[in-house]
């Protein structure tokens, strides 16, 4: 068991050191590439400066030489001659020669400028080609490094994908929980509202029942009162009727002579043989 642990630890250390060495070598190669590109750009800049300096020196030497030549020609020129029009011949010829020299100098300057522009165009093309090749080389190096680190990159991508998936799942669960809580709160609010409405309806029903009961009680009392009044009226009528009958009997007694005021009358029926 101890040997296997030591071997695994040594292997892990070896892999870690190899990875560290690879990273170090990659960083060194990148720094070397950057240093090469920097040196090349510096050398190109120094070449450009040297060319500019040589051009300026050549211009100054050309102007000095042309001045010396003009001075020599003036010194070696014969005395002025006069033509039929009274003009000096030497001056006219010198003017023509001067114009020719100026034209030649202009042509030479134009050619020199054309060569300079051509050289600058070529230098620019060389710089662009160099930059393109450097870019291709860097892209190739990057591709090689990516190919070397393909498995590591794939593992890192998978790790990030899994991490993003976990985060999304967590966010989704949290969102579902929030929705569930919101639905529960809404359901509770609805139930509370329904309960309040139900209680209000029950209260209204109780109030209506109470009012109906009170109305029924009042109606029953009123009916009892009416019945009692009707009974009293009936009793009063009965009493009045009895009193009337009594008075009528008394009057009849008086009329008929009852109470020994008149003799009794006897009525008999004769039977026929």
Swiss-Prot record:
- The question of whether Protein biosynthesis is a record keyword is answered with no
Q: Which organism is it from?
A: Homo sapiens
User: Which portions of the chain have biased composition (kind: Basic and acidic residues)?
Assistant: 66-84, 93-113, 238-253
Identification of the protein by name: Arginine and glutamate-rich protein 1
In terms of Pfam families, this protein maps to: ARGLU (PF15346)
Q: Which PANTHER family match?
A: ARGININE AND GLUTAMATE-RICH PROTEIN 1
Q: Which family does it belong to?
A: Belongs to the ARGLU1 family.
Indicate the segments annotated as coiled coil, or none if absent: 93-253
Per the record, the gene is ARGLU1
